[in-house]
């Protein structure tokens, strides 16, 4: 059993539509635990830094503006194979292609307003977690 951490964002469109609780319930139903969470309003510098790998791409400025458009929830999830399991729960980036029952199929408005972000690898998860959380802000919980 490989317990790992992953990083997740509930994006501005989902926060605005009061979907935080619904998304958290879906995460917890998978057996993953939320071990750190906070609400933020990203600055331009934070959004640009977080999405630096996309700098220079045609959608970069729009993505940064969207992520600054309202509060976001950032959280650390922990569980067995958390990166893969959370990506499966999220569904494909394009909600029209996302599996029925996935977060994006159920909650996303469009490819741009797709409600959630999740790390795509354990390495990305570690980098993204460290971008928003100090180690002492993460509170592992014993498994039941």
Swiss-Prot record:
It is an enzyme of class 2 (transferase). HAMAP family: NDP_kinase (MF_00451). It comes from Aliivibrio fischeri (strain ATCC 700601 / ES114). Keywords: ATP-binding, Cytoplasm, Kinase, Magnesium, Metal-binding, Nucleotide metabolism, Nucleotide-binding, Phosphoprotein, Transferase. Its cofactor is Mg(2+). SMART domains: NDK. Pfam families: NDK. The keyword Cell wall biogenesis/degradation does not apply. One of its GO terms (biological process) is UTP biosynthetic process. This is Nucleoside diphosphate kinase. The active site is at 117 (pros-phosphohistidine intermediate). The keyword RNA-binding does not apply. CDD domains: NDPk_I. Major role in the synthesis of nucleoside triphosphates other than ATP. The ATP gamma phosphate is transferred to the NDP beta phosphate via a ping-pong mechanism, using a phosphorylated active-site intermediate. ATP binds at residues 11, 59, 87, 93, 104, 114. Coiled coil: none annotated. Homotetramer. Its EC number is 2.7.4.6. Belongs to the NDK family. It catalyses: a 2'-deoxyribonucleoside 5'-diphosphate + ATP = a 2'-deoxyribonucleoside 5'-triphosphate + ADP; a ribonucleoside 5'-diphosphate + ATP = a ribonucleoside 5'-triphosphate + ADP. It is found in: Cytoplasm.
